[in-house]
Regions:
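Pre-active-site segment of Zn-dependent metallo-hydrolases
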Residues: 10-61, 131-176
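Structured loop/turn residues at beta-strand edges in well-structured enzyme cores
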Residues: 39, 102, 178, 206
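Metallo-beta-lactamase
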Residues: 70-125, 144, 237-249
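Active-site environment of divalent metal-dependent phosphoester hydrolases
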Residues: 27-30, 49-54, 77-80, 95-97, ...
């Protein structure tokens, strides 16, 4: 299988029999038009309504490939970003779908929408969407509990409670499986100290064949690479993405 980094949290996976595209936002290197030239079935996933994970441009691809299957989180419909008939499959946490070629399970998120488990060609793939321990930077030695103000998000949060929600989602996912061939997971230095904590907790919970960082822009590549010291300690391969359009075989 070939995994290609498109941008931010957007990826394409090409197998011997199909193409999977996750959380498309932008395509600086023009990856998608080349993929749409194939005769393989194409499946497009969007994990939630945030603009950095969902772009209505995906529906314009039907002009090139009328047979694309769109698999979207139900929260996108709830936020009126699309009409129901525009997507083929709508899933919320706990929902599943299969067509014989791929099997999809929508797992939870402690933010918006869902995360995805996709099984195809003997591989189990995980895309986290916005599942992450987003407020880990507040869990310092001097934190005494309760609410703290997050200037980035403009809200008061309880980081201890948020971490429990995140770990609860991991527990629910583990009820389905304890291992993945490849995992795409947020490692976003913009959220401050502790930005690797969620990914570290994930690899402590699951067997991972390859960990792939996401949820950053060009300025965040090197900060994402810091996660490699933690994957190396557990003998987990880590992909140090260096630019949009990078690919790796796994």
């Amino acid at each position: 299988m070939r995994l290609t980094y498109i941008f931010h949290s957007g990826f394409a996976i090409e197998t011997d029999r199909c193409i999977l595209i996750f959380d498309y936002w932008m395509d600086p290197e023009g990856i998608v038009p080349q993929l749409l030239k194939t005769e393989k079935p194409v499946y497009v996933f969007s994990s939630h309504f945030h603009e950095d994970h969902f772009n209505r441009e995906i529906f314009s691809w039907r002009q090139t490939r009328s047979d694309i299957i769109y698999i979207l989180s139900k929260d996108i419909l709830k936020h009126r970003r699309v009409q129901k008939e525009e997507a083929d499959v709508w899933l919320a946490k706990g929902g599943t779908w299969s067509d014989g070629l791929i099997r999809v399970a929508a797992t939870g998120s402690n933010d918006s929408g869902v995360s995805w488990i996709v099984e195809t060609d003997g591989r189990r793939i995980f895309h986290a969407g916005d599942l992450n321990n987003w407020y880990a930077r507040f869990l310092t030695d001097d934190y005494r509990g309760g609410l703290v103000y997050s200037a980035e998000f403009g809200i008061d949060v309880n980081p201890e409670k948020e971490e429990k929600r995140f770990l609860g989602e991991l527990k629910d996912i583990r009820k389905i499986t304890d291992s993945f061939s490849v995992v795409m997971f947020p490692v976003d230095g913009r959220i401050g100290n502790g930005y690797t904590r969620g990914a570290r907790q994930f690899i402590d919970t699951f067997q991972v064949g390859l960990l792939v960082p996401m949820h950053f822009v060009a300025s965040g590549f090197e900060s994402a690479w810091r996660m490699k010291e933690f994957t190396d300690a557990k003998n987990i391969p880590f992909w140090c993405i260096s630019r949009e359009g990078d690919s790796i075989e796994f």
